[in-house]
Curated annotation (Swiss-Prot):
Name assigned to this protein: Protein XpsM
Domain of life assignment: Bacteria
Residues of the signal peptide: none
InterPro entries for this protein: T2SSM_b (IPR034756)
Pfam families: T2SSM_b (PF10741)
Lineage: Bacteria, Pseudomonadati, Pseudomonadota, Gammaproteobacteria, Lysobacterales
Length: 237
């Protein structure tokens, strides 16, 4: 009797088991999520503006600006220190040039400068007319100094001169050293007597004789009392 044979039945194929589908998310839930995300971002922004920015970010920015300004200042100081020898040399040269320039009066104060102007005037008149035969100072009085960029010192002058003598006096004053300036010149023709034994036609001249003090000089007030030249008051009208 033949032996019985057993054959296994074929196993069914392993097919993937389908997952159950989730139901679609309602639109209201999506909208709520976006609203919640927006509110979260808004809260974070407000918290940054209220808590972080004024207490941390803003002070750090201020410190950064201060550091930048300090770096720039340090750089300028270093450059100035490097240029200090050249600046000192140029300053010394400028001072020497200022001392040698004839444009400023040598006196250190307005009072002394006014006296120096009067002496210059008297020398110019004596050179133009020795013995005051044809030119004389009838009056000269210092004016108050004018302090602007440079201190102007002036003397109000009145002369009695002939025409050639006046030209000589003005030339001597304006072309000497230090340089002087003749301002507000007023010339009038007038018959006058230069000496008891002589008479003729001459000029009555009024002007301001001015000069400038060096920077840093004392520009204090001066005595402005009029003082006719000694020995010449008799020539005044």
């Amino acid at each position: 009797m033949p032996a019985a044979t057993w054959t296994a039945s074929p196993s069914p194929p392993n097919w993937p088991v389908p997952m159950p589908r989730r139901p679609p998310m309602p639109r209201s839930v999506k909208r709520d999520r976006w609203i919640a995300l927006g509110l979260l971002l808004l809260v974070m922004g407000v918290a940054y503006l209220v808590l972080v920015h004024p207490w941390f970010t803003q002070p750090m920015l201020a410190v950064q600006d201060d550091l930048q300004s300090l770096r720039e200042r340090e750089l300028r100081v270093r450059v100035q220190l490097q240029q200090a020898p050249q600046v000192s040399q140029r300053l010394q040269q400028a001072r020497q040039t200022l001392q040698s320039r004839p444009g400023f009066l040598p006196e250190s104060s307005a009072e002394l400068a006014s006296a120096g102007l009067v002496q210059r005037l008297e020398r110019a008149v004596v050179d133009a007319s020795p013995g005051n035969r044809s030119c004389a100072i009838s009056n000269r009085s210092p004016l108050q100094p004018e302090t602007k960029r440079f201190t102007r010192v002036a003397v109000q002058v009145r002369l009695r001169c002939g025409t050639p003598e006046l030209a000589s006096v003005l030339y001597s004053l304006e072309n000497g050293t230090p340089r002087l300036f003749v301002d507000n010149l007023n010339v009038m023709a007038q018959r006058y007597q230069l000496s008891p034994n002589e008479s003729g036609n001459g000029l009555d001249i009024a002007f301001e004789l001015a000069g400038y003090l060096r920077p840093g000089s004392n520009a204090g007030p001066v005595n402005t009392g009029a003082a006719p030249a000694a020995g010449e008051a008799s020539n005044a009208p």
